[in-house]
Amino acid sequence: SRPFVVRMITDSLRWWCEAIGIDGFRFDLASALARRRGEIDGVSALIVAIVSDPVLRERKLIAEPWDVQGYALGAFPYPWREWNDQYRDVVRKFWLHGYTLKSGDMATRVSGSHDIFFYRGPNSSINFLTAHDGFTLADLTMYSEKHNEANAEGNRDGTNNNHSWNLGVEGPTDNQNILEQRLRLHKSLMASLVMSAGVPMLLMGDELGRTQAGSNNAYSLNPELNWDATENFGGGWALSWDKRENDLSDSIAALSSIRAKYLSEIIDEFFTGSIDQGTKRKDIAWFHRDGLEMGANSWQDNSLRYLAFMLDATHKQSLFVILNGDK
């Protein structure tokens, strides 16, 4: 918060923008920047200086809104965007069995997390399922437990709260039925991400089926390991273009096209369920598997793993999305 430190940081950021052409920044452990007198309030001297700067405020500003001392999701001012770990955890729990979850929680995250970003809009939420920390998408359905033995810390490092599901076999398998289920879950997770209101973030390599062999703390691996070493996931740090999962990659491309065609112009604001006087349709409507619209009591159901919603995408077309976590 000291003026000369704030000036040094903002001058450095502005130099990267003006001299190099950087169009945005992601701030690691950003809640440390928002802390004032020991409390996180989003109006620290540095945060105010960044959002007040005519150059920096026009760049993409993305916060990881937590650090070792605190959690600050939703505390950053416009135009900051924030990594939404609540989105990550809820969507994982919906698709990967064995976790308690109210159906309303999934609907809230898919429709933009209005409970967190009500005053700023859904585009303030960076929706993600995987990141550089934690499991890859492939490992979410291959491992129920972390495997960080190669880090030489007795597998104590890395979180134990992965919300993952191995479908009965820990690690790789030749069982074709399990392989098909895993691929279907990968597609379902990606469909939820791409079809949600908010800004979707994909971990590079997930679209290719990249694995870390169950490691959820790759940062601590020895960087001098041979690329082909077993401890280095058989080259998992690099993208295996020759072993890529074309089916998954093609599916993500198709989903992205659907988002661009139907959703790009209607997800800047939260869906409310209100009726458009021009189309006489709700901007979003939620349905049970029997086709009946969901009522208020439905949102407290802990066992419901099926959600369907219709978006009033255009005056001529609507988009109907089914999320079936039961099968």
Question: Where do the model's predicted regions map?
Answer:
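Short, acidic/polar
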Residues: 2-18, 185-190
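A short, structured beta-strand-centered segment in the mid-to-C-terminal lobe
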Residues: 3-6, 14, 236, 240-259
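Residues immediately flanking
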Residues: 29, 65, 323-325
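Acyl/amide activation-and-transfer machinery of modular secondary-metabolite enzymes
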Residues: 219-239
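Carbohydrate-binding surface patches
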Residues: 286-327
